[in-house]
Amino acid sequence: YFAPSKRIPVETTAEPTQSETAAPDRNDAARSAFQRALRTVHDDLRWPELPDSGNIEVWEPGTIEDEQFAVTDVDGDGEEELLVSVSNTYMAGMCEIIYGYDPQTDGVRIESHSYVGVTHYPGMLKVEASHNQGYAGDILWPYAIAYYDEAEDSYKDAFYVDAWCKDITDYDSYTETPYPDDIDTEHDGYVYLITENGERRFMNRADYEKWEAGIFTNKEPLTIPWQKITTANIDALVK
């Protein structure tokens, strides 16, 4: 389960070049399973494979047919996945789920469950936080990084990225930590926080930019072929 508790927008200076997702051989068994899953979403307003919190509530006058799905190889494993995104709902209900086909059950299984602010990269997801209620201010919109684990056929949390602006506070009462002036060697007035495996570390701007380049250099966002969750589009998956 991959669901950071925060929200969207990042500043970019230019539109990134987007690469197309791979075009795997069509698997009609998988598509039939995706079709059944989408009918559960469309007809029953339920998320498949989420028995405890599976109800979908769409705010009127919108309907489920205003929400989106895509069938494409998003994780790069050579097989198609089903992506379903619901955003016209209460904040906690906004989510995107990536489903893979499970040939053992002839059904679907969840590869990723996250907030809707997702940018897809080959083998990687960047998920914008749903809120920015910490100390980041305008420096950064918090985000998480997850990597595709081929052995597990699912995405695994890797990093959570936040920032701390000294103008907002010079003391974190939650962790009882003073602002790390020793890290902010350029006196920018802010530092970045990288959480990995439950361990948080601070970085100054120069170190963060190097770290960020290591994550994103040579990675282009994938173009996801989104379409509306309509009966016609669902029926067209398998003819």
Where are these regions (language model features)?
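Acidic, small-residue rich beta-repeat scaffolds with periodic aromatic anchors
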Residues: 4, 8-9, 23-40, 130-239
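Beta-propeller blade repeat segments, especially FG-GAP/WD-type strand-to-loop junctions
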Residues: 93-111, 146-150
